[in-house]
Amino acid sequence: MIITAELSLYPLQENYEETIISFIKSLKSQNNIAVYTHAMSTFVKGEHKDVMNAITIALESADNSSKGFSLVTKIINRDLPVEKGFLEF
């Protein structure tokens, strides 16, 4: 099943940019998923197991590099057209 997940990471620290960029780079390093970064959130598309595995790995990376964070996640069981408006890292 193809899913689209919208992720917004909010590190609970002053130096938050590094944690967010590391989180996005970790997602982008995973195989079998597509990652689209927008101004306020990042979209991940792919097979359910691949998307969930990529999020788990990225969360472990964020957990090691921050003092705490909040991850707001929305998941839909559809291939949403989120390609327009994304930012390159």
Regions found by a protein language model. Give the residues of each.
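Charge-rich, low-complexity N-terminal segments
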Residues: 1-89
